[in-house]
Amino acid sequence: MTQPIRDSLGRPLRDLRISVTDRCNMRCRYCMPREIFGPNFTFLPRSELLTFEEITRIAAAFIRAGVRKIRLTGGEPLLRADLPRLVAMLADLPDVHDLALTTNGSLLARYARPLRDAGLRRVTVSLDTLNPATFSRLADTDIPLDNVLAGIDAAQSAGFFPIKLNAVIRRGVNDGDVEELAAFARDNGHIMRFIEYMDVGNSNGWRAADVVPAAEIIARISSHWPIDPLPPRYPGEVANRFRYRDGRGEFGVIASITQPFCRDCTRLRLSAVGEVFTCLFAVRGHDLRSIVRSNTDSAAIDAALDEAITRIWSRRSDRYSELRALDSDGSREDADESEASAVPGRSTHPGHRKVEMSYIGG
């Protein structure tokens, strides 16, 4: 088995997240606020998007570098035409241990069965609330919440089990929904994951005061149902997991603000136009599309991809969330400023604008 390459901090490359489109049919405030991503916003033209064949070729190169888990994201990935065909192509690659999809669920009722038949193994659905009015306000959409719930049911009927449900919790917005979401997941055999509101991109108006700490979420759930912590299932797992003592499943929290996990991050993100980003909070990407579209022979293209991926990952040193946490508690007074300046996404430095989450997926 290929040993994964490691970055400058010793982190192995194991996970690849592939954005297949920058478009979405919702306008969630924490990702694509309508005042920025409105009718006049220019999305990527189709000619600039990687083809399915190009995506598969790049994915194969990442597998040669040690990647074993692939997740398709967006925007909303189900807006990409004929997505089950891409799933089938990726599922046919050797040594892919996990092939998953993250979706807002609005189109999942239509695509759950074709995706499963094509070889998709897992589905994660964004579900920030079970209140229809709160949902409409959060997602800034006319799409009914029932469409998302129907998509979750269809995925379960198609054989996806367990289904993970992601909820980004914001103070004063949906923090009152935590217990209801947990109960819904318990009652239906799903795994609920509560995510601390993150300062991703530049357009979501993030404030630290809006963050509901994972510790508070855990305390609230444990006051209703006794729980016990679970060990990580694999190195680099981002969620802290807990099981319900009554045997009715588990839930997780992703505490990227209060408990950064940069030191264990094994993920790399590929945008829909073939740019590679080594951090969710990155400022700039690395172009792979020009390699796969170069006018040269197949072996030379594969060799160039292998070299580029090794170079990009081996030079990686970003740990944005850790440095943010150090800044916030004053622990970085003696930190090397050159390190901070070199870290992608350091928004505390003038001119550094982080890539938007809708461009590279969450």
Curated annotation (Swiss-Prot):
Domain Radical SAM core residue range list: 8-228
Keyword DNA repair annotated: no
The UniProt record lists the keyword Flavoprotein: no
Keywords for this protein: 4Fe-4S, GTP-binding, Iron, Iron-sulfur, Lyase, Metal-binding, Molybdenum cofactor biosynthesis, Nucleotide-binding, S-adenosyl-L-methionine
Binding positions ([4Fe-4S] cluster 1): 24, 28, 31
One biological process term in Gene Ontology: Mo-molybdopterin cofactor biosynthetic process
Molecular function (Gene Ontology), one example: 4 iron, 4 sulfur cluster binding
Stretch list, region Disordered: 325-362
EC number: 4.1.99.22
Residues binding GTP: 17, 71, 102, 164, 267-269
Name the record gives this protein: GTP 3',8-cyclase
Gene that specifies this protein: moaA
